Regions:
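Conserved phosphate-binding catalytic cores of ATP/NTP-utilizing and phosphoryl-transfer enzymes
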Residues: 1-4, 184-217, 376-379, 432-451
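Early-domain small/polar-rich strand-loop-helix modules and first-structured segments
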Residues: 1-109, 184, 235-240, 247, ...
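Phosphate-binding loop and its immediate beta->loop->alpha context
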Residues: 28-177, 258-304, 308-350
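Phosphate/ATP-binding catalytic cores across multiple sugar-kinase/actin-like superfamilies
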Residues: 131-147, 192-207, 335-387, 405, ...
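Hydrophobic, small-residue-rich alpha-helical packing segments that form membrane-like cores
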Residues: 140-145, 153, 160-164, 168-223, ...
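Glycine-rich phosphate-binding loops at beta-strand->alpha-helix junctions
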Residues: 154-169, 308-312, 359-364, 383-409, ...
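Conserved phosphate-binding/catalytic loops in two-lobed NTP-binding clefts
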Residues: 178-191, 360, 406-437
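Acidic low-complexity intrinsically disordered segments
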Residues: 309-380, 449-592
Length: 592
């Protein structure tokens, strides 16, 4: 059945947005879906975003917290959950998206709320993500009953730095929520750029020229995403090609909220109030609301922070301090966007043997240092190449002070006064940009609009165990064979050199895969015998049994790889002795 609508969904750490447009219009008529949600017991209101918060209950859900036609298997999603988080922090799940990409925990196990140890209230990051997506699907079905969600063309955006496992978990959550099997992922920074192109119309070609280099800096509630895009020319027409994406950086609005909570706790301490763990978590949520107010366009000079006193709700009362806008701006601007040189680098993690289990926030919160490191890895290795344009995305950049500081810092890195930095403006709402850009991506694909080229955002490798005498207690060294080069276009294939490798068949085996965002020049068939720890990232291994033609054992094979139009890496292991072939598959798409 032909889809009636293009739908783009920004599944955000703090807020989620659904945008849509009729599929058959000659112009992209993009709108944002008002999302029904509980705002108070017994009250349902429509908002243009869905706060990514989930209030948990023991037992059946009270009818005052239900919406007709909405599935609510896990609790209350949206505005009421966000609002109540400061009062009941141990019952509200927040930052599930950040936990979904936390590779050192089981993201399918009940972990959240992290502060609550009750098994009845805890939920997995995967299930929490499913709850948010389920609410969005139900909101669509309620308002477009003649156009079932599963029959539309859907794009779900993810951070450019999301690894394979995080994308697979997100895909699982989406399918469970009611997405069609053929929905696609799109990188959030690319979606933001598509939104800017849509906002400019044909005028974007007058603002950019050949050899310009764009930095998309996307700082959201949980992550910082960096993407480089270069303007190229093909047969007289300007084109956009992605050069690189940054590493996964767990820095965003959540870190800022924690920073303000630390500042506020000192204010409470100066009044003789030492906060306990429950109060500290409550303060974190209160600081999130305060930050949003104090950094808004019409911000007050200060906001009160009210925390329940120790003891019961009735006996303890509340304690309060005022948080000043000037302190908030100076603390966050200097802490997260300090003026640094192009050669400054973020500090590495500590060497403490034991660390508390929790979200793996970056040890260094200076976003400007991470930008410098990113450009050092991908841009400034080429002489005379510089950033010519900057595109902001993410709710953090609603604050003018953050934008101004980043422009000043990056501008200071350019070598001459003529190397000016141009900010790409004209975006009315940064909170809706990604969802709207995802819709325009689909429209452009169908109607011949500009497409951002770039292929795979990473290079991919398979782990090959080396041969040699066994040494007791020492595993054999592992080599990495490049099977997909950086930027390999979807729909293409390549032969992986002439190297023969032994493939284990007839027995369950563990296949190890790696990816890299920094090794952009490795060729198919290139064998790495050693690499720096920060160059390759191992993805979750694949354990499977490949059928044996004869007796189980090692079969000499050569490789061919193909990246399909759906973003699947197909690795063909072809026998060097017979016509037998085996295929392994990995999802590698973070953008089409």
């Amino acid at each position: 059945m032909t889809a009636k609508y293009h739908i783009g969904i920004d599944l955000g750490t703090t807020n989620s947005v659904l945008a849509f447009a009729p599929a058959d219009e000659s112009e992209a008529m993009i709108a944002v879906l008002p999302i029904p949600q509980i705002t108070a017991p017994g009250t349902v209101e429509r908002r243009l975003s869905l706060p990514s918060f989930l209030l948990r209950f023991e037992g059946a859900l009270d009818p005052a917290f239900t919406i007709d036609g909405f599935r609510s298997p896990y609790g209350v999603v949206g505005e009421y959950a966000r609002r109540i988080a400061s009062e009941q922090p141990d019952r509200v799940i927040a930052a599930a998206k950040s936990w979904l990409c936390h590779g050192t925990v089981d993201r399918t196990s009940p972990l959240l709320p992290f502060e609550n140890e009750s098994p009845e209230l805890r939920l997995s990051p995967l299930d929490a993500t499913t709850a948010y997506l389920m609410h969005l699907v139900d909101a669509w079905e309620q308002q477009f009953s003649d156009a079932p969600f599963s029959e539309q063309r859907i794009v779900l955006t993810v951070p450019a730095s999301f690894d394979l496992d995080a994308r697979e978990l997100t895909k699982h959550a989406a399918i469970t929520a009611g997405f069609p099997e053929d929905f696609v992922f799109l990188e959030e920074p690319q979606a933001a750029l598509y939104n800017w192109i849509h906002a400019q119309g044909d005028a974007w070609r007058k603002q950019l020229k050949r050899h310009d280099t764009l930095l998309v800096c996307d700082v959201g509630g949980g992550t910082t995403d960096l993407t480089l895009v270069q303007v190229t020319e093909e047969q007289g027409e300007l084109e956009l090609s992605r050069l690189a994406v940054g590493k996964h950086l767990l820095i965003g609005g959540d870190n800022m909220d924690l920073t303000l909570a630390h500042v506020a706790s000192q204010l409470f301490a100066s009044k003789g109030h030492k906060l306990n763990a429950w109060q500290s978590t409550s303060l974190w949520h209160s600081c999130r609301l305060a930050k949003e107010s104090l950094l808004s366009a019409k911000a007050p000079n200060s906001v009160p922070l009210n925390i329940l006193g120790r003891g019961s709700k009735l006996i303890g009362g509340t304690i309060s301090v005022d948080l000043d806008r000037a302190i908030v701006e100076s603390t966050l601007v200097d802490g997260f966007f300090p003026v640094v040189s192009l050669h400054d680098r973020p500090i590495e993690s500590g060497d403490t043997g034991f660390q508390e289990i929790g979200l793996p926030f970056e040890p260094d919160s200076a976003i400007t240092k991470h930008v410098a490191a990113f450009l050092g890895d991908h841009l400034h290795k080429t002489p005379n190449q510089r950033i010519s344009h900057l595109l902001f995305n993410g709710g953090v950049f609603n604050a003018t002070s953050f934008r101004d500081r980043l422009v000043h810092t990056i501008g200071s890195w350019n070598q001459t006064s003529q190397d000016s930095l141009t900010v790409l403006g004209g975006i009315d709402d940064l909170d809706q940009a990604v969802a709207c850009g995802a819709v325009y991506y689909l429209w452009a694909k169908d109607h011949g609009g500009i497409r951002i080229r770039g292929g795979t955002a990473r290079s991919y490798y398979i782990g090959i165990e080396s041969t040699g005498p066994a040494i007791p207690g020492i595993p054999r060294p592992l080599h990495a064979l490049c099977v997909v080069p950086h930027g390999m276009e979807e729909g293409t294939e390549c032969v992986i050199g002439n190297k023969e490798v032994g493939l284990r068949t007839g027995k369950r085996a563990r296949f190890r895969f790696f990816s890299s965002t920094t090794r952009t020049t490795d060729k198919p068939g290139q064998l790495l015998k050693e690499w720096d720890d920060n160059e390759l990232t191992e993805t979750p291994p694949m354990e499977t049994e490949l059928a044996a033609t004869d007796s189980p054992g090692l079969v000499p094979v050569k490789f061919e790889s193909r990246v399909t139009e759906l973003g699947i890496l197909e690795l063909f292991c072809k026998s060097s002795r017979t016509d037998q072939s085996w295929k392994l598959e990995l999802q590698v798409r973070s953008a089409d």
